Every structure is written in C-alpha cells, then in structure tokens.
Amino acid sequence: MTLTDFSAALDAAGLSVAALDAAGADVVHISPSHHYPTGIVMPIARRQELLHWAEREPDRFILEDDYDSEFRFVGRPIPTLFSVDEGGRVIYLNTFSKTIAPSIRISYMVLPHRLLPTFREKLGFYSSTVSGFEQYTLARFMAEGYYEKHLNRMRKRYHQKRDAVIACIRGGPLAERARITEEDAGLHFLMTLDTPLPDGALRRLAAQRGVRLAMLSEYYNDPAAAPPHVLVVNYSGIDIEKLPRALARLAEIWEEQDHA
C-alpha cells in the first residue's frame, strides 16, 4: 500500500471539501471542534458537507481528532462528526493530555462498527504501552464521576485565565496595535499585530528582548500564503505576572520603528 500525504486549503469554515476532491483524497485528518493553529470551529453545514464527501466513495474515511475540544467558552458545544455519522465513515480520536496532564500519555480511538473486524484481524495483537495501573485509575476516576467535575473546574479556570490574559493585552501598550480573534474555544487564540515588519524580523526582534513569538506563518507549508503578523498565543502556560513586562518589551519594537 502506498500512502501520499498532502495539505488541503482552509477557508473561514475550515477544511475545503473542494480541495479534497481536487486532490483525490480518500482519508482526511481534521480537528473540526477547534483547528490548531487557526482556531477555526467548523460549522454544522461544513461538517455535513464533509460527511457527504466521505459517503460518495466506499472506502473514504474521516479521522476526527477532537484534541482541545473540551474547552468551549461561548455557545453550546457542536456535536462531533462521529456522533452524527450514520454511514460509519468517522474514526474518532481524543486524548487526556489537555484535560488532565500531558504526562499521563493516554489517548483513545473509537471505531465505527464496520471497521472492528478489520482492526481485530490486523491489530488484535496490539497492547497499550501505558501501564495498567494508570489505565485502571483513570477508568475509576471517570466511572465515579470525578472526571466531569474536574473538567468543569478546568473550564472555569482556563476561562478566567483567558479573560485575564486578554484584559492584560487590551489594557497594555499594544492595545491599539493588537486584534484578538478565535478566542471562544480551546487554549489558544490568535493575535494580529499592526506592523509593517515581516514575520521573521518581528520574531527576531522579539527574541532579542527575551520574548519568544509563535507566528501563524510557521505552521503553513507555504509561509508566504499565511496572513502576516499573526501570533498563536497559547495562553494556558502564560505567567500572568510576567505578561505586562513581555508586552512592554514588544512595544519597544514599535517605539524604535516610530523613531527610525
């Protein structure tokens, strides 16, 4: 079997189905609940379009990676593709890395019934590398209702953390130069900066001041196709007490440009 991988174009609603058709794809890996790094949440209409794409051919499948989906702060959660898939075309993937801890290293996969015989035939020998003790502990944690309570606490904590980070940015020296988007879900958002500097120069000048920036263009196969001056801000790990100093150092870049 030969596998050819490729990237597909995104629009405001997420993955372009027309791009899948043009590429002749049979399998697609997506994160419809909160795409990383763009933060796009795929609307219901596009999800239905994607399911119809999969159903047009007998061996098309969708790998739904629901990573980071548990943290939605505005509106009701959108149903997963797996939950509305009537044709058995969606393979669901998720992990506990965000909701509990990366060190737990436990993820899971839910197969459509039609794939179970093939899985048992081809991969029935597979044994998880995670210790049985950790798996059993997590199972008990969930079965006894503690996981849902923990998740609610984490949602509240990250909601407060997100609000604090955004308030600090909007009340700081970059308030007139920064536009925040895609902040309603997940543990990151985008921040577009008003600057004539190319991304590489902006990142270099920030690094000279001890501030590490993650540019959206770094995630593109073709960086030139990315919208310029957009930062990917993973706010969950930000030290809120150090953020004002980091923003002040970034503001120095504009001050130097204004006096150049």
Feature roles, as predicted:
Residues 2-73:
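Active-site phosphate-binding strand-loop segment of PLP-dependent enzymes
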Residues 82-118, 133:
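Active-site PLP attachment segment
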Residues 111, 190-196, 213-253:
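Conserved PLP-binding active-site segment of the aspartate aminotransferase-like
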